[in-house]
């Protein structure tokens, strides 16, 4: 950023034109709908080979031998890769932050820990030949005892899966404590409620499967990959291959959905790169749908115990909670899930004391990692259903019960979370009004119910993966040519949510231009500036602030030339509707292009460049907080949501209809209303799937429904009437007042539906999913003995 760039040069709200009340089309929309856009599996390079992987068919076993001799004889096979081809250290991840980040080999050497572990890879002239070669490779195993239940995995004498042998398979533990003495709060409370809850495994099910195309040339590995973390992948791959990061170039093309599933430490990209080096030809690998289900990260099943203490009016005083996460056999980005789960236990409700403990346990189940909301969907289901049951036990209206305890602006949690802008009460008031709760609550028919939920989420997570030890960061560069056209260089990873458009709009707004005047160059580790990646709702807030600062930097440099020409102070100028204007004299204005040309004439013809970066100084975030008095603020801002669901339950069959869903989300100032509505409706859709349809059914570590035929999604016919509300106060720290809207909005869907089913039937709901069989069994007094694993 320009050394003299200051707040005086930031555009004031009265000059906003593009963001806020407008709907504008995404800059990648035409390429996507016409098929011109390229995804990682769409690249066809001369001489390109196809790669396939040999994967473990055993959940826990020693590898005695790998025989590739028959595959090597097959015509068309160009290379076969095994662990012996990786010199040092051959592991993916970043052990600098947590050793559990780097507990996974690129290709397994001597022990498989799950079905689907990567053992070997083949590069061949086409997919059919590659698959034949994979089938010819013989792997000899010796089975060893496996463990699939996280509670059994923590017992003495349980099979050791991963991590240090003396940790009882606990890969990560986080303790979130603070405030007054919890024992005293519970002892003196007017009412205490306790319950156990359980959530299930779910897959991201992005339309695009994971894919990579790699080309090794002139000593550089270039990898086009479906990823959420191109700079992180560059570092992880260089670490695993023992080469300098500059020798690895990761480019993120269009990505057909991520939802957290494309940010873990996978092998397919590095394997394609290594095979390209071995063959001196480009190599492409596209995972099958079955591979994505079994090998890629799923949503964590979590087992939760919650205790809450309340005063006589129902106000929340204190909370104790224990979270057990089934992480599968590896850490990866799932390491952060443990700490994240403790954050959601502290939001959105105020309390004087909190004591939350989370343990992520290694098992031989499929690997679990990040998924939209990073455990918030699971934790808010458990904790908000708990609030519903507690309100009923105390005989208090469920909305009033929540409203008296939700956070207010300026609230600081006992664990150190600092709430700034906050419309949680307004969100609850909105859904209460729009679902007509007060008129309908005493007039619901048999089998008809209304349920509510509230939640909170980070906006711009402080959890790092690469850069500073306790904060994530973003940088953006803006270049303006002699014609006044702007190019935005950002390392932010758009995975389908429209962040490229957001970055463009933020820069265009600050410079008083339209989207047509702006081009974006994104996510190329050799061209674009560093960005931590797409996770934790950080892109709009962190990368967006960096983009705005880059535009302000360029604008300030421009004004410091034009201002003296006009005899006015530089900070009294503004960019508006394609012109540079004086805010004080209407007669002083100039086309933006002409102003840039004058700047270049004075500065030797160089492009006008602005640089911006953002990392919130007040943010701290650790993966394994263990101190009783540690206080951590995880983000510069937090979003808040409330939802209301109206359902009808057929008590004969257990089938439910979600008739109406009202959603209010405090996302600050909406930059693009159409995009916000799409994110909120998408969150409802994914939440309906998580609650009522989608379930990765596993047996002995094997997913039994690893395809779109057997894994049930909600269709358009299953979706409720959706009404979304998001006009709430701007956040002072967010770019043009914006906060997140794509992840936190998924969290209150499941508890609202569960609470509505409880309202309609009276059955106590403590487990997901809520499919017809599950509901029918409970309606008929049968014990729900299904297990999330």
Enumerate the language-model features and the residues they cover.
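Helix-loop-helix junctions that connect adjacent transmembrane helices in secondary transporters/permeases
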Residues: 159-241, 406-485, 704-718, 723-725
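Extended active-site and interfacial segments that coordinate phosphate-rich ligands
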Residues: 27-31, 135-144, 235, 239-240, ...
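C-terminal catalytic domains of large/alpha subunits in multi-subunit enzymes
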Residues: 83-84, 242-247, 277-283, 312, ...
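Short beta-strand elements
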Residues: 31, 211-216, 303-312, 318-323, ...
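Flexible, low-hydrophobicity surface segments
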Residues: 1-171, 462
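Glycine-rich loop/linker segments at domain edges
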Residues: 22, 27-34, 96-98, 102, ...
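Thiamine diphosphate
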Residues: 235, 254, 258-280, 284-286, ...
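Catalytic phosphate/nucleotide-handling subdomain of diverse soluble enzymes
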Residues: 459-461, 466-528, 542
């Amino acid at each position: 950023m320009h050394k003299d760039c200051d707040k005086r040069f930031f555009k004031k709200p009265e000059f906003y034109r593009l963001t806020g009340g407008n709907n504008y089309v995404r800059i990648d929309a035409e390429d996507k709908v016409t098929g011109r856009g390229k995804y990682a599996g769409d690249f066809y390079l001369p001489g390109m080979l196809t790669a396939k992987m040999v994967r473990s068919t055993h959940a826990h076993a020693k590898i005695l031998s790998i025989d590739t001799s028959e595959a090597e004889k097959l015509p068309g096979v160009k290379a076969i890769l095994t662990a012996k081809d990786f010199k040092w250290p051959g592991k993916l991840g970043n052990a600098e932050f947590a050793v559990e980040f780097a507990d996974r080999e690129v290709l397994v050497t001597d022990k498989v820990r799950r079905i689907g572990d990567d053992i070997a890879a083949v590069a061949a002239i086409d997919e059919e030949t590659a698959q034949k070669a994979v089938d010819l490779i013989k792997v000899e195993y010796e089975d060893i005892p496996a463990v699939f239940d996280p509670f059994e995995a923590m017992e003495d004498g349980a099979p050791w899966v991963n991590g240090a042998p003396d940790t009882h398979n606990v890969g990560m533990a986080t303790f979130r404590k603070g405030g007054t003495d919890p024992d005293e709060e519970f002892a003196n409370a007017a009412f205490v409620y306790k319950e156990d809850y359980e959530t299930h495994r779910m897959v991201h099910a992005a339309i695009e499967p994971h894919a990579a195309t790699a080309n090794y040339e002139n000593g550089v590995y270039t990898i086009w990959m479906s990823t959420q973390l191109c700079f992180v992948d560059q570092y992880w791959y260089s670490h695993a291959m023992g080469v300098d990061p500059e020798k690895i170039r990761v480019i993120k093309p269009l990505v057909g959905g991520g939802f957290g599933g494309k940010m873990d430490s996978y092998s397919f990209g590095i394997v394609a790169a290594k095979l390209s080096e071995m063959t001196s030809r480009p190599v492409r690998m596209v995972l099958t749908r079955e591979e994505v289900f079994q090998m890629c990260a799923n949503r964590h099943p979590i087992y939760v115990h919650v205790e809450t203490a309340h005063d006589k009016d129902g106000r929340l005083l204190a909370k104790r909670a224990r979270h057990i996460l089934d992480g599968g056999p590896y850490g990866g980005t799932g390491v952060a899930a443990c700490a994240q789960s403790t954050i959601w236990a502290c939001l959105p409700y105020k309390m004087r004391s909190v004591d939350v403990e989370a343990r992520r346990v290694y098992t031989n189940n499929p690997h679990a990692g990040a998924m939209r909301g990073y455990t918030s969907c699971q934790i808010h289901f458990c904790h908000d259903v708990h609030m519903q049951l507690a309100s009923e036990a105390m005989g208090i209206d469920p909305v009033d019960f929540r409203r008296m305890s939700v956070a207010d602006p300026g609230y600081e949690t006992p664990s150190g979370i600092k709430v700034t802008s906050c419309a949680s009460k307004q969100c609850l008031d909105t859904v209460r009004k729009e679902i007509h709760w007060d008129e309908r609550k005493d007039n619901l028919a048999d089998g008809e119910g209304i349920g509510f939920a509230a939640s909170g989420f980070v906006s711009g997570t402080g959890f790092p993966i690469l850069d500073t030890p306790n904060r994530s960061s973003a940088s953006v560069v803006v270049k303006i040519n002699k014609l006044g056209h702007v190019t935005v260089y950002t390392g932010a990873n758009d995975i389908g949510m429209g962040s490229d458009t957001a970055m463009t709009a933020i820069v265009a707004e600050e410079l008083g231009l339209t989207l047509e005047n702006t081009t974006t160059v994104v996510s190329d580790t050799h061209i674009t500036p560093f960005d931590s990646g797409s996770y934790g709702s950080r892109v709009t807030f962190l990368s967006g602030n960096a983009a705005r600062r880059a535009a302000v930097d360029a604008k300030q440099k421009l004004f410091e030339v034009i201002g003296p020409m006009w005899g006015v102070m530089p900070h009294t100028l503004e960019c508006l509707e394609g012109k540079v204007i004086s805010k004080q004299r209407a007669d002083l204005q100039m086309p933006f292009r002409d102003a840039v040309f004058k700047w270049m004439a004075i500065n030797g013809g160089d492009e006008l460049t602005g640089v911006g970066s953002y990392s919130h100084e007040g943010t701290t975030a650790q993966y394994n907080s263990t101190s009783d008095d540690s206080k951590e603020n995880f983000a510069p801002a937090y979003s808040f949501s409330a939802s209301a669901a109206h359902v009808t339950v057929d008590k004969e069959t257990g089938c439910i209809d979600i008739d109406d869903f009202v959603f209010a989300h405090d996302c600050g100032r909406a930059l693009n209303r159409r995009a916000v509505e799409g994110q909120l409706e998408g969150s409802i859709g994914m939440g309906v799937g998580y609650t009522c349809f989608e379930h990765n059914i596993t047996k002995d570590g094997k997913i039994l429904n690893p395809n779109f035929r057997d894994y049930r999604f909600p269709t358009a016919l299953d979706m409720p009437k959706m009404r979304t509300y998001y006009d709430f106060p701007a956040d002072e720290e967010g770019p043009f007042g914006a906060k997140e809207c794509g992840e936190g909005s998924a969290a209150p869907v499941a508890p609202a539906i569960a609470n509505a089913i409880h309202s309609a039937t009276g059955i106590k709901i403590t487990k997901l999913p809520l499919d017809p069989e599950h509901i029918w069994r409970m309606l008929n007094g049968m014990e729900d003995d299904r297990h999330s694993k």
